[in-house]
A protein has these predicted regions:
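N-proximal low-complexity "stem/linker" segments adjacent to membrane-targeting elements
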Residues: 1-81
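Residues at the starts of beta-strands that form the adenosine-phosphate
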Residues: 57, 83-85, 167-168
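Proline-centered loop/turn at the N-terminus of a beta-strand
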Residues: 59, 84, 116-118
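Hydrophobic/aromatic beta-strand patches that form the interior of the parallel beta-sheet core
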Residues: 86, 118-120, 170-172
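Acidic ATP/Mg2+-coordinating residue in the GHKL
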Residues: 89-92
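Active-site-proximal specificity loops/subdomain of glycosyltransferases
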Residues: 96-164
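Short beta-strand-to-loop acidic/aromatic patch adjacent to the donor-nucleotide binding site
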Residues: 166-179
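Acidic donor-diphosphate engagement hotspot in glycosyltransferases and nucleotidyltransferases
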Residues: 181-183
Length: 184
C-alpha cells in the first residue's frame, strides 16, 4: 500500500485523532525501502506484512439498524481478513427478528471464511449494566437500556475493543454499497 503520511491530529484527552490519510495505491509492489531523501517521501510504502500486523491488532465496528442483509454481507466480506469484526445491531427484534437474521448472515460468512467476530444487540441489558458500572449512565435511556443512535452503537464498539485489548479501531457503515472501498 502507498499511503500519505499523517501530518495533523486532534487530542481528546489521552486519545489522538489523526486526520484522513490519502491512499495512493492498495498494492505498492514488491518490498523495497522508503527513502527519507526521496522527494516523494510524503507518501509511505506499507508492506503487506506491516498491514497484516496492524490488522491483527484492529477491530472493525459495524453499527447496523434494519439494513438490507445483502449490504451487510458485502460489508463483512470487504473487511480485511485479520481484523476482528464487531457488529453492533440496534435492529428490530419484535415480529421479525432482524437481529437474528443479521447474526445468521455474519455467522455464515465468518464460518466459511474462517474469521473471528462478535455481534451484540445495542439493547442488551448486560451492556447497559456494563456502562452503568463504569459510571457512564448518561448513555442509558429511561428504560435503563442503551439509547437509540449510531453514536451509542459506536461507543459500545469502543468499549468492546478496549475489553478485548485491541490497539486499533475502525468504523464502517452497514449500508456501504461499495464493499471494495472498505479496504481503503
Amino acid at each position: 500500500m502507498r499511503i500519505e503520511l499523517s501530518n495533523a491530529f486532534e487530542r481528546l484527552g489521552n486519545v489522538l485523532i489523526y486526520g484522513t490519510q490519502k491512499v495512493y495505491a492498495l498494492d505498492a509492489g514488491p518490498e523495497g525501502p522508503n527513502h527519507p531523501n526521496d522527494k516523494y517521501f510524503v507518501v509511505r510504502k506499507v508492506a503487506n506484512e506491516q498491514s497484516w500486523n496492524v490488522e491483527q491488532e484492529m477491530v472493525i465496528v459495524v453499527p447496523i439498524k434494519n439494513e438490507k442483509l445483502k449490504l451487510l454481507e458485502g460489508v463483512i466480506t470487504g473487511i480485511p481478513h485479520n481484523c476482528l469484526i464487531i457488529v453492533v445491531s440496534n435492529s428490530d427484534r419484535d415480529d421479525v427478528d432482524r437481529f437474528n437474521m443479521e447474526k445468521n448472515v455474519v455467522e455464515n460468512i465468518c464460518h466459511f471464511s474462517k474469521r473471528d467476530f462478535l455481534i451484540v444487540h445495542q439493547k442488551d441489558p448486560e451492556i447497559a449494566e456494563l456502562f452503568e458500572s463504569m459510571g457512564y449512565a448518561d448513555i442509558l435511556g429511561e428504560d435503563g437500556l442503551i439509547r437509540d443512535g449510531k453514536s451509542e452503537g459506536m461507543l459500545i464498539g469502543i468499549l468492546l475493543t478496549q475489553l478485548l485489548q485491541k490497539k486499533y479501531i475502525g468504523f464502517i457503515d452497514s449500508d456501504n454499497y461499495f464493499p471494495g472501498s472498505i479496504y481503503e
